[in-house]
Design a protein with these regions (language model features):
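CN hydrolase (nitrilase-like) catalytic-core segments centered on the catalytic cysteine
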Residues: 33, 42-128
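Short amphipathic alpha-helical surface micro-motifs
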Residues: 6-9, 17-21, 90-92, 109-114, ...
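A conserved C-terminal secondary-structure "cap"
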Residues: 137-166
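Intrinsically disordered, low-complexity regions of eukaryotic proteins
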Residues: 5, 122, 152-154
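Glycine-rich, small/acidic residue-mixed loop/short-helix segments
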Residues: 130, 135
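Active-site catalytic loop in hydrolytic enzyme cores
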Residues: 1-54, 67-76, 143-146
Length: 166
């Protein structure tokens, strides 16, 4: 959950209204597996890798990023999730100015497995569409087979204290 107190006195407390899920979900459809996530989840790359390994071809990321954070991170994070998994990313995004003063970024996106943005809804309400060619998933994963090369790592050993200049 996105709970944070910002320096300017603004606070966000998603935990007051929402309960976090306890498992990743891939929904099977007649067309493909949909990896189901929401908003803040996009910051946890391992979740998207797990969804792709479990059969997701399309990663769903509905979100309500603030205008400031969205401008800095939204496109980059979604493109990274597409590239590192070889999946399409479909990310509907809330936009506009809200009664509580919050401003959301918008830019509903559809991103291809190679990272290209296929559709960008901009900052106004609307609909975005793109054709998903599922052969591009195998092509992207064949060119960068990171999912098949992925493996678990032991935690890093703590660094010992070092003298200055070492």
């Amino acid at each position: 959950m996105f709970d944070v107190d910002l320096e300017n006195g603004v606070s966000f407390r998603e935990s007051k209204a929402f309960k976090p899920g306890d498992r990743a979900v891939v929904a099977e459809t007649p067309w493909c597996g949909l990896g189901m996530t929401v908003c803040y989840d996009v910051r946890f790359a391992y979740l998207y890798r797990a969804l792709a390994k479990a059969g997701a071809s399309v990663l769903m990321v509905p979100a309500a990023f603030t205008r400031q954070t969205g401008h800095a991170h939204w496109h980059i994070l979604l493109q990274a999730r597409a590239i590192e998994t070889g999946c399409y990313v479909v990310a509907p995004a809330q936009c506009g100015d809200h009664e509580d003063g919050r401003q959301t970024y918008g830019h509903s996106l559809i991103v291809a497995p190679w990272g290209e943005i296929l559709a960008d809804g901009g900052e106004e309400p609307g609909v975005v569409m793109a054709e998903l060619d599922f052969s591009r998933i195998d092509k992207a994963r064949g060119m960068v087979p990171a999912l098949s090369h992925d493996r678990d790592f032991a935690p890093p050993a703590p660094l010992g204290l070092r003298a200055a200049g070492e």
